[in-house]
Amino acid sequence: MEKVTLIVPVYNVEKYLKRCLDSLLNQTYNNIEILCVNDCSPDNSQEILDEYEKAGRIKVIINDENLGLGKSRERALNKSTGNYVMFIDSDDYIAADYVEKYADAMKHGDYDIVIGGYTRDIDGKKKKHYVKQSDWSVLSYTIACAKMYKRSFLLEHNIGFIDVRCGEDIFFSMELFVHKPRYYVMENYAGYYYFFNRKSITGSLNADRKLEGFVSDIFDRFINKYPVVNMEKDVYWKICYNYIVNMINALVVHGHGCGVRNMKEKYEFFMSDLDNKFSDYKKNPYLHYGKMRKQSLKIRLSVSIFMFFNKIGLDKILYYIIAVI
């Protein structure tokens, strides 16, 4: 039985931490290492961690300074001893068969990543989200959790997280993608429970946080590390598509209702940034609805609507409508 390391960054989650840890300790899979990283949490999370560590149930790493979610994960990854690693956010929780399901899938193929769906928990209301088998499950399904990784693959390719306060999973997923991992998708499993914590960084984003700036910075840093001139054309087009998807999400999901003046600024930034990074984006074959059958319907429609209005010169009107809804 291969060892699996579960990595849990901890910051300001005392209300939910025991639920998370108990779900990890209640697994049907036995060979588990649990590494918790206290990222200078200002609440009583450390007292809870001490309780579990004294019982010999977890190992605790304490950061000397606040590193953020991604770098805390990376620090634990470098100290892990498992054959496989999984990331768990400390306000989330997992089903009892979670690790066993992923480990069984890993066992049946020489995979670098096994990917599953998740169950979104918003105020006790649960909705399952499933993933389809395709390259897009690695690239644009950007949640770092709900996946199992071969530890040696991550270390061999120096795949890690960047020090941003939001969107670190976008960079991590793109870095995985360009190294062409062998992957498998469990299309009918959603044993990761993603709890919508309104106090978390992503849960508290609003129009004033300028998420489009975060997205731009993440792609700048990715392109700096992996220059587009060195990319295979198909990889380049998919990275370009992923940029557009994330920018549309920044404008529509996090920017709706922000007012016309704010949206004008956001949209003009998006288009200028798109031209600077991917000046030939209109030639991208993946921007056509029919090419993206294995992408989620929501994403396909969002990109197709954007491209249609862009083509006929009415894209600004579309986003101004979103600005006041």
Task: Please give the residue ranges for each predicted region.
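A conserved acidic beta->alpha catalytic loop
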Residues: 23, 38-47, 65, 89
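Short, well-formed alpha-helical segments that are part of the catalytic scaffolds
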Residues: 12-26
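Short aromatic/hydrophobic "clamp" motif used to bind/position activated sugar donors
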Residues: 85
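Glycine-rich, basic loop-to-helix element that forms the pyrophosphate-binding segment
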Residues: 63-80
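Conserved nucleotide-sugar donor-binding catalytic segment
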Residues: 134-209
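Membrane-interface aromatic/basic loop that binds lipid-linked glycans or pyrophosphate carriers
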Residues: 256-325
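Conserved donor NDP-sugar-binding/catalytic core segment of glycosyltransferases
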Residues: 97-127
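Catalytic core of nucleotide-sugar-dependent glycosyltransferases
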Residues: 190-197, 204-233, 241-278
